[in-house]
Amino acid sequence: MRLIFVLLATFVNAAFSYKILVFSPATSKSHLISNGRLADELARAGHDVTVLELDFLGISQTTNSVKVAKKRIIDGFQESTNFKNVLHGFSETVMEEPSFTDEIKGWWAYQNVYNDLCAEFLKMDDIFNELKNAKFDGFFAEQINLCGFGYAHALEIPRHFLISSCPFAAPVYDFTGLPMPTSTVAFAADLSISPTYTERARNLFVAVLTKLEFTLLNNRLQAHFQHKFGEHFPSLYSVTSDVDVIFVATDEIIDISTTTLQNIVHVGGLGVDDDVAEMDNVFASEMSKGKEGVIYFSLGTIANTTKIDSKVMRTVLDIVKKFPDYHFVIRADKYDLSTREYAKSVSNAFVSDWLPQPAILHHPRLKLFITHSGYNSIVEAARAGVPLINIPFMFDQNLNSRAVEKKGWGIRRHKKQLLTEPEEIEKAISEIIHNKKYSLKAQRIRDLIKSKPLSSSQLLIKTTEWAIKNHGLDEIKFESRGQTTWTYYNLDVIIPVFWLSISLVIPTIFGWYKFSCFGHVEEKKGKSKRD
């Protein structure tokens, strides 16, 4: 009887499970972990999930990105060295204030190498045939590059889901058909709490140019797909804009509120609480130190402490000395010997190249997290109810820091202040540890997230199953997806009408002036002067 029950349960589970492919290029450890968490949630729900990790950086083997889903690693990319060099370039210049042209060049270099890596992947026919024969029902990929969606179309996977790994960047608005909120959301350039005219103008200008750059880069990627699959291969933009659901790996409680759509679903925080494990004795001992508690400091992986100005970490440790009642747990790169050496003279500092971040953030003695504002760190802190000092460096980090600042559970500081105004960092630390409003607001953010009617996991699983079961969700896709900004805002109507109006109004005014009494007076004055 028990055997029959087990067989019946297995049959029922198989009948209602779907085969899902998660496309997860190794662009950073945080992206691998984020995609792995999403895959694991679907796998725990009984679906047959495969995570395809294209190991661009040689980090997949050592990154514990997947716990339940299947993991398939593809390595041996010739362009990996060039990709690493681009990322190292970001680390080396991370403390500089890049000009607009520097940002354009950096993004161009990044996407160009990404496109070349995609072209390499397209040549792996054995992998392609294996995946095509697997007959997947659904496909997930991030927004960073459109390689995955072109590949999914070639594999003939019927249902596509876009993962926005961070708050929307300018090109994503094209996929959705949403108007870009350039006056309120700092997704292209910085906007203060009350944006000035100059800030709004720069945000709009950078957003438009970023979209243009992405289009040009996408055309090059399109050429790779047409070379492989024929000249009639559809536009990658049209393939991507036709996704059934956009899963945003952020939480609407944290983000700056803006316009949304029926097929945009926020799933920030997937698997975060699952990673909260017990600390080993070493870290548990460190968390017990400090008369008033513990402060955690981490700049993430892009701001590599070995490559940035050594004065940065020395400044941080000098700040630590001024708060003797608090113990500081600090992350530094494993090759950063100078920081470790200097830290020996700081009695209330512990430095390590790896720290159990989720466990640290949930520890009751933690009072503050000083972070680079990467979204994984933001959402982990939010779910733990920990106030933040945000020091953004690049990418979406500036937008994330502004969102925290606007919601009132953290303070933003400029990265240059680590070198030029360390007293401003000190003031921020003092403000948060002495003013309870930040911790109270952080706890409210935590409570709002955890008491939502549906969890991120439930939304992900139920929405995915709903879309696949019903063969798509065309009925809720935004009508303007794929429309250009030109037609969405009726600029093709407004501008011609404007110029036509000008062409009629100016001659009319000129004619009225010439034949009016004013015109006659001017004409008489002219004659008098000639006489």
Curated annotation (Swiss-Prot):
Its EC number(s): 2.4.1.17
Residue positions the entry lists as glycosylated: 304
Intracellular or extracellular location(s): Membrane
SUPFAM superfamilies: UDP-Glycosyltransferase/glycogen phosphorylase
Molecular functions (GO terms): glucuronosyltransferase activity; UDP-glycosyltransferase activity
Enzyme class: transferase
Membrane-protein topology: Single-pass membrane protein
Keyword Magnesium in annotation: no
Gene Ontology cellular-component annotations: membrane
Record's catalysed reaction(s): glucuronate acceptor + UDP-alpha-D-glucuronate = acceptor beta-D-glucuronoside + UDP + H(+)
Signal peptide limits: 1-17
Main subcellular location: membrane
Stretches that traverse the bilayer: 493-513
Keywords: Glycoprotein, Glycosyltransferase, Membrane, Signal, Transferase, Transmembrane, Transmembrane helix
PANTHER family linked to this entry: EG:EG0003.4 PROTEIN-RELATED, UDP-GLUCURONOSYLTRANSFERASE UGT-46-RELATED
Family according to the record: Belongs to the UDP-glycosyltransferase family.
Protein name: Putative UDP-glucuronosyltransferase ugt-46
Organism of derivation: Caenorhabditis elegans
